Curated annotation (Swiss-Prot):
Keyword Flavoprotein: no
Name of the protein described by the UniProt record: Interactor of constitutive active ROPs 3
Entry-linked Gene3D superfamilies: 1.10.287.1490
Family label: Belongs to the ICR family.
Reported function: Acts as a scaffold, mediating interaction of ROPs with different proteins.
Ranges for region Disordered: 1-73, 88-135
Quaternary organization: Interacts with ARAC11 in vitro.
Phosphoserine PTM sites in chain numbering: S533
Tissue expression as described in the entry: Expressed in flowers.
GN (gene name): ICR3
Residue spans of biased composition, Basic and acidic residues class: 63-73, 98-123
């Protein structure tokens, strides 16, 4: 009775039954074409078991048969689009990974370049440690900057792509690096200013050096003049010494001549006195003889007597007489000679007086010459004293000149030191130029490395953005796949339920047909045909459309959610 009510009752009953019976048919038509569905075997078994039901339900409208493949194709297109998008996302992820690897390689290359630059900078530091404290500070700051850059680049490039929060810190550190580079540039500007100060000091030193060289030349000229004057004074001193020696010799000769003249004068005076005394004696004798000529005869008588006596005496007396005669003869000769001498004595006296006068005049001349020589000797002594004083002064000058020579030697040493300082300064200038050139090259390298790092960061950011986009797309695709899998699981559960219900309905229908086959064949067939009428199929189609529409709406909502 209940089965009759169900068949002959209100049209709500087939509405409840038809959608449940229509769903498995729809999904059964979808699932054989999709090879990924695991329920295809379970959907085929009821077809094998109940061919009659399928044969009964086979006559359907062509519109529903046309609509079903279109929805299936839409779902297949959605699935294929999702798969293509998943492939694209995977490709983008691989591209982003390759770009990330390239960026890491470029970063490693830039890090190597920075390490090479830092090594070069360290070598330049080792070479120019002794130049100046400023250069050491600049080199240390540069080395610290490059080490910090290299360490930060190492730290930045060793970070994984997942550490997105460190990008802000990296940007901050890049700003700090830029500030440090600006500080280095400012320190280099200060270094340039100090180099300019050094150049100004060098110019001042050059001016002082020119002044010292001018003074040295003046000292040289003065020294040459002193040497010339010294030679002249030495020549004058030798000449004066020679003249002094000649004067001494002349004085000695004059002294010897004077002594000889004095001695001869004394001798002549003695002889003159003797001649005067003789003349007096002869004059007295002559006067006596003139006054007493008898004495002369007496003398002759005495001589004759004496001779006679002597003749009578011994031979000794003869000898005495002869001696007396000789004496008398001598006396006569002496008288005669005295007379002659008296005459000659007057001449000789006059001549002697003349000679004496001449000698006195010569003596006066000699005395005057001696006085002159004494005066000249005094002059020479004064000149000699003056020369000795000049010699002392000259020795003092020589000492001063020796000091000046020492000063000149020191000046030479100072000049050599200044030349060495000039050479060192030129070397330092060349080294400073080289260091400035190297700093410029390092600046350019740093700028290039900064640009490379910025490009790498830009590429990394682009790669990160692409990776984020691809990850978002992958997440969206995975969510869509999960949603489709969830919807598929829901549909599978519903299909299982519908299979169970369809089996129950089939069993009930078979039981009803078995029970009513005896008397109600026509009515049951009619009702059965009514249930299998195109109207019921249309209702089933509408219900399946609604259900599929709801499923499609759910899929569309799930598709649109990640895009928001």
């Amino acid at each position: 009775m209940q089965t009759q009510k169900a068949r002959n009752g209100s049209p709500d009953v087939p509405k409840k039954v038809s959608p449940r019976a229509a769903r498995p048919l729809k999904i059964a038509a979808l699932e054989p074409e999709s090879s990924s569905s695991p329920i295809s075997a379970t959907n085929r078994t009821p077809k094998d078991k109940s061919p009659n039901v399928l044969n009964r339900r086979s006559p359907r409208s062509p519109v529903s048969e046309k609509k079903r493949p279109s929805r299936i194709t839409e779902l297949e297109l959605l699935v294929s689009q999702l798969q293509e998008e998943l492939k694209k996302a995977k490709d983008q992820i691989s591209v982003s990974e390759t770009s990330k690897k390239q960026a890491e390689q470029e970063a490693e290359e830039s890090r190597k370049q920075l390490q090479e630059v830092s090594s070069k900078l360290e070598e330049s530091q080792n070479q120019f440690v002794e130049t100046s404290a400023l250069e050491e500070e600049t080199d240390k700051t540069g080395s610290l900057v490059f080490q910090s850059v290299s360490q930060e680049c190492d730290w930045e490039f060793s970070a994984t792509a997942g550490e997105r929060a460190g990008l802000a810190a990296v940007a901050h550190e890049i700003r700090q690096l830029k500030l440090q580079i600006e500080m280095v540039a400012s320190s280099e500007a200060g270094h340039v200013k100090q180099a300019e100060l050094y150049n100004s000091e060098v110019q001042l030193l050059r001016g002082n050096l020119m002044d010292t060289l001018f003074h040295v030349e003046n000292f040289r000229n003065q020294l040459k003049d002193c040497e010339i004057s010294e030679a002249e004074t030495e020549a004058l001193a030798t000449e004066t010494l020679r003249q002094l020696e000649n004067a001494k010799k002349a004085v000695e000769e004059l002294k010897s001549d004077g002594t000889k003249a004095v001695e001869s004068y004394k001798k002549m005076a003695v002889e003159l006195e003797q001649s005067k005394s003789r003349m007096v004696w002869l004059e007295a004798l002559v006067n006596k003889l003139q006054n007493n000529p008898a004495d002369l005869e007496n003398h002759e008588i005495l001589l004759k007597d004496y001779e006679s006596l002597r003749r009578g005496e011994s031979n000794e007396m003869d000898e005495e007489v002869s001696s007396l005669r000789c004496e008398v003869e001598r006396l006569r000769a002496a008288l005669e000679a005295s007379d002659k001498k008296d005459q000659e004595g007057n001449v000789e006296a006059s001549s002697r007086l003349r000679i004496q006068a001449e000698l006195q005049s010569e003596l006066k001349i000699a005395k005057s010459e001696i006085d002159e020589l004494k005066a000249r000797l005094m002059d020479k002594e004064t000149e000699l004293q003056f020369i000795s004083e000049e010699r002392d002064n000259f020795s003092m000058k020589l000492m001063k000149n020796q000091k000046e020579i020492d000063v000149e030697a020191e000046l030479k040493k100072l000049r050599e030191a200044i030349e060495n300082l000039k050479a060192d300064l030129m070397d330092k200038e060349t080294e400073l130029q080289i260091v400035s050139d190297e700093n410029e090259t390092l600046k350019s390298d740093i700028h290039k490395s900064e640009t490379d790092v910025q490009d790498a960061f830009l590429k990394l950011g682009i790669a990160m953005e692409e990776a984020d986009k691809s990850s978002k797309k992958a997440v969206r695709v995975t969510e869509q796949l999960e949603a489709t899998q969830a919807s598929n699981s829901e549909m599978e559960t519903e299909l299982r339920k519908l299979k169970v219900q369809s089996n129950q309905w089939r069993k009930a229908a078979e039981a009803a047909t078995a029970m009513l086959s005896a008397g109600n064949n026509g009515k049951f067939a009619e009702n059965y045909n009514q249930t299998n009428s195109p109207y019921s199929e249309d209702i089933d189609d509408e219900l399946t459309k609604k259900k599929n529409g709801n499923v499609l709406k759910k899929i569309g909502v799930l598709w649109k959610k990640p895009q928001k």
